[in-house]
Amino acid sequence: MSRFRIAGLARTGLAAAAALSLIAGAANAADQVTFLTSWYAQAEHGGFYQAKAAGIYEKAGLDVTIKMGGPQVNGMQLLLAGEADVMMGYDFQVLNSIAKGLPVITIAASFQKDLQGIMAHDHVKGLDDLKDKTILVATPGRTSWWPWLRRKYGYSDAQTQAYTFNLQPFFNDKNIVQQSYPSSEPFQALQKGLPVKFFLMADYGYPPYGTTMVTTTKLVAERPDVARRFVRASIEGWKSYLKGDPSPANALIKADNPKMSDEQIAFGIKRLNELEVADGGDAKTLGIGVMTEARWKATYDLMVQEGLLAADTDWKKGFTTQFVKDLKITSR
């Protein structure tokens, strides 16, 4: 055999090997997913950052990019435009989107409890003890939790003032209570040495889920395995973050949001565990991330009752349990 023939065969063999290598690489390539949060990085987003930092997404065959939300970020718009594959959502937002005919769907709930609550001075006994108080409510709250609180306890719009995310009015007046998240405003009060109480609305019957995973109906239809792996890995991330070593996620959180301190992150993790937002309720037995039709129906009923949603909205289009019903990943 001539040397030219041998060289030709060698080149052919190398080309074939290269082609096989490319095919194998393509087969093993991780699926890319862009996840958009609802705000700046914080402990309340820790499960997703943990799944990224600890390699849980990678083990699931996913290359996940986490993008922070913020006050000027329209998450739903970015999701529908294809700039994000999954976003951190909210039940009211999703049901309103369904009413508008938008192709979105909730695939899991990180938290069994929405994180919205009320911060009050330490003499206040509970959410039923606000009749003589001034209640600070931000604009979005007037079309979500405030109608529920107002009806449940007989409060009035005359009690409310605008919440501008400035805590000074609260600090200066013991007759003021205000909307709050468990690890944000109470932490700032703690830094001031001011004793406060925090009342989570979910513990008083407010029905929406918290920190949900929302995607498009197209992704669920065309890439269900990607959705399934993303949900499972994210839930494993939450279990690891809240019950294990959170330091991998915390490093990423601080890299994305340098204003977030170790102290505030630790305070946030402590409060999330104390309030059992991820592993309480149905999640105790059915697993973190679980959703039920009954809970979604309760949110739909609330919105319709308060005139926030048309009664003919097909609320069942707002969620699917196919990715969470059989996982049963508990914290125990």
What is the meaning of each model-derived region?
Residues 2-15:
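Bacterial N-terminal signal peptides that target proteins for export
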Residues 16-17, 27:
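Cleavable N-terminal signal peptides
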Residues 31-172, 176-180, 199, 207:
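Short, glycine-/small- and polar/acidic-enriched structural segments
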